[in-house]
Amino acid sequence: MKKLVFCDIDGTILDGSRKMEKLTPETLHAINSLRRTDYVVIASGRCMGLLDRQIIDLDPSGFILCNGAYDLVGDQTVFRDSFSKEAVEKIREVTVAYNGFYIFEALNEMYVDSFDSDAFQLFMSGWAKVLKGFEESKVADKPFHIAIIGFCDEDSCQKAGEQLKDIADLARHKGFYSYDVNIKGISKATGVNRIREYLNIPYEDTYAFGDALNDLEMLQAVAHPVIMKNSDPALKTYGFEETGDVLDNGFYRYLLTNKLINPL
């Protein structure tokens, strides 16, 4: 029976915060091996337009994008959902009230309210070249699948999060005053379940690898959840099996040790 492996990107097979910006030969071998014999799905909070070319070039079996709000197997869309107009307006209103920035993501395009705000410069300035300005007249009919909001201080971040928790599901970014803002009830687990059903894979043959709180539901939705040694401490409290650090090819090493792939 084929296995179905879900793999996060940031902190799991890449780590830009620690200058690991290219996939290692071991990771490339692992994903190529799984793609030939089983199924491997890249699971990300990002939209397609924010994925590195090296990730797209992996040509995995599928993608979970926008933390589960847009899910693909090959070229087939198996699930998608978007924010209501009311939710978009509430997220904008609360974020601005606390001097934050917001980014709304469609499948291939991202829109930011201000390139000049202090909060944006603090957290997201490196993304400026791939973002567009949020102009209401131009985005009125855009389907947005996820948002990112960020602030200048902890107090603003916490208060904004409290005001939004009833209309969206928020996942805090480790080490930053910012969140992924997900459609209420949607998570990477949504993609796991839709893709597993589409491919008709038994639960006992499912695996997931992650390192952050936006991976929690995905990890809980599979039979074999695995977290990285460098995971958010909050994720480690759930008792998931742990593999090595991303810098030590933890993803590859787990697959090799458990005989899911052959050595490089």
Residue locations for each model-derived region?
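Short hydrophobic/aromatic-enriched beta-strand-loop microsegments
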Residues: 60-67, 81, 124, 225-229, ...
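Asp-based phosphoryl-transfer active-site loop
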Residues: 3-19
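Asp-based, Mg2+/Mn2+-dependent phosphohydrolase catalytic module
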Residues: 221, 225, 229-264
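Non-catalytic pre-domain segments flanking phosphatase-related domains
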Residues: 1-7, 29, 201
